[in-house]
Amino acid sequence: GNVLAFRILPGVDVLEQRWGAARKIFEENPQLNIIGVEFVGYDSFKANTVVSDYLAKFGTIDAVWMDAGGTAVTILEAFKDAGAPYPKVMVGEDQQDYLAYWKENNLTAIAPTFPTFQWRTAVLSAVMFLEGETVQRNWYLPQPDVTAENLDQYENPEMPPLHYALCGCEDMTNYPDAWKTPDINKYVDVP
């Protein structure tokens, strides 16, 4: 089937690792026809245009692979806008807007994760170091896949669209209320 691959940015470690794994799988499966590999940044307009252009050129897109899911909903909406069927297989990430769209439209999809809670690891290890504690050499952090079987566990309609299900913030003060309605006015530039 026709596979359209979306990349966000070149040179980002986790995205290059994902692309390397995908490329290997694509090369080992000649029945997969990779019709394009497109860098779109997080530009929704560009992602929509790419889908429209490839649908016009190839007629069908059977699967969409993404190295990051920031434009997943836009990509799916581009299929809908074109009157084309959704891809038979869709790869996105654990953003709430994508998980909700997946659930609402009963897609065949998956959401590999690179949990945003990993940012905490560097901060925690720095605090441990500064307090004279031993910092472990290796950190093993879970990276579960969101699948149809566990989608309900991660999709949370109370959270904002760009909220990552694997935020690692569940045990933080004021979660989830502070995440539902963030006060963006408290973040101001200090002269």
Residue ranges and their predicted role:
Residues 2-5, 25-44:
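Short beta-strand elements in bilobed, periplasmic/extracellular small-molecule ligand-binding domains
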Residues 13-23:
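Short, surface-exposed alpha-helical segments at coil->helix boundaries
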Residues 5-6, 37, 104-116:
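Short beta-strand elements at the ligand-binding edges of bilobed clamshell
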Residues 12-15, 40, 44, 65-68, ...:
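Solvent-exposed, acidic/flexible segments
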Residues 21-22, 36, 40-101:
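Hydrophobic alpha-helical
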Residues 1, 17, 46-48, 94-99, ...:
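Hydrophobic alpha-helical segments within soluble ligand-binding/sensing domains
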